[in-house]
Amino acid sequence: DYTVQLLCVIAEAKTIGFLPQGDQVQTVKKLVNKIENLLAIDPDDPQNYYVLSWLNFKVGSIPQVKKFCASILYGGLPEQLTVQKGIDYMKKAISLRPDYSVYYFDLGVYYKKTGHPEEARKLFEQASTITPNTPEEFVYRKRAEKELKKLGV
C-alpha cells in the first residue's frame, strides 16, 4: 500500500541520525530508491518531495572530507544529493501544498543555514501567517515566530 510505504520512508528518514555511520550511508541509498519508487506511483504527493528535500539538504551539507571518508569506509553517499536540490525539492513541495506552513519553515531553515537571512526571514514570516490546520503546524508556527525574533523581526 502506497501510504504505508510512504510512512515507513518518513519513519526511516527521521531515525537515520540514530544509526551508526555505515548504516546511515546505506539507509540514505535505500531511501533515495524508495522515494523514487513512490514518486513513480504518485508524482504529485508533496511528502515525497519533502523527504527527498531533507535527504538532499542533509547529505549535500556534509563536508567533502567526510564524504570522501564515507566513500572509503562505506562505499560512498549518493553523489546526486545536493543542497541546491534540497532547496528545489522543498519549493516543489510548497507548489504542491502551498497552505502547509511546515514546508515554508523548513525552506527558511535551509536559507538561514546557507547564509541567506533575508530569504529565511520571508519564509519564516509566511510560515507564521498561514492558519494552522494540524497540530504540527501549530508547533511550526511558534518555531517560525522564534526564528523571526532571532533575526530581529
For the regions a language model picked out, list residue spans one by one.
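Short coil/linker segments at helix-helix boundaries
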Residues: C8-D44, W54-S95, P132-N133, E137-V139
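Register position in tetratricopeptide repeats
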Residues: K14, K58, K113, E147-K150
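Residue-level recognition of tetratricopeptide repeat
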Residues: D1-Y2, D45, Y100, T134
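Structural register within alpha-helical repeat arrays
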Residues: C8, T15, L52, D106-L107, ...
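Glycine/small-residue-rich hydrophobic helix-like segments
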Residues: Q84-L123
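A cross-kingdom marker for long, charged
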Residues: H116-V153
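Short, charge-rich amphipathic alpha-helical segments embedded
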Residues: D1-L6, P117
